[in-house]
Amino acid sequence: MIVSKISGIEAIAFDIDGTLYPAWKLILHTIPFFILHIRFMNAFRKVRHILHRRSSSDPDTALPDFFNVQNELLATQLNISPQEAGNFLDKEIYKGWKKKFLRIRPYPFAKEAIIRLKGAGFKIGILSDFPPEQKGSVWGILPLCDVALNSEALGALKPSRIPFLKLAEALNTSCVRILYVGNSKTYDIAGAAAVGMKTAYIANPLVSFFRKKPPYADISFSNYRQFLNYVL
């Protein structure tokens, strides 16, 4: 039997980028890449915004081939072929950034907290808008997971309901018994809440200190020791 300060939860799932590691660390390590490929990265940012917006406006419809659509949108932005856009994206970002993540460290105590949660009986999951394996073992967290999903492969980025429902299905746990942890109010928290999951928002320390239960999430925390204390 799981004993938790948050009643009714049986599984805890995490976003990765900005949630398990500070987003600024990736920015720091990719500055040279951004400068060298600024046109492509600006186009990619616009395309992801379009795809996120689509997921928000039509949260129950998946794209039949997400990657083809993404490549076509990129091709339009850059005036190149979809194949060229897709090849660059796959080689330089999806695969090419793997080595950058080797130099990035996770938030302190993140892995240790997840080990404790796993030991307490919780199912552990990951749901990310990028492939979890892009981060290798996700700093040793991936082997602890019962489920690790990439929303792109499911045809819809967050905050679409689809990836969150697929997460619940893969965990074999009803949405109301899942706590989802993320750093984006718009994508992580809104998407998880829309299917009935409980939500935890990793926030700026001052925000977390002054407002432990913000209106947009069930709990807010600024470090993983604090998060563990809220749950166990």
Feature locations, PLM:
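Charged, low-complexity surface patches
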Residues: 63-64, 106, 125, 181
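Alpha-helical elements of Rossmann-like donor-binding domains used by nucleotide-donor carbohydrate transfer enzymes
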Residues: 29-33, 69, 73, 112, ...
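A generic "structured core" feature
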Residues: 25, 104-107, 163
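Active-site neighborhood of HAD-like aspartate-dependent phosphohydrolases
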Residues: 1-53
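A metal-dependent, Asp-based hydrolase signature
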Residues: 52-95, 116
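Asp-based, Mg2+/Mn2+-dependent phosphohydrolase catalytic module
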Residues: 1-14, 111-232
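Surface-exposed cleft-lining segments at the edges of enzyme active sites
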Residues: 95-104
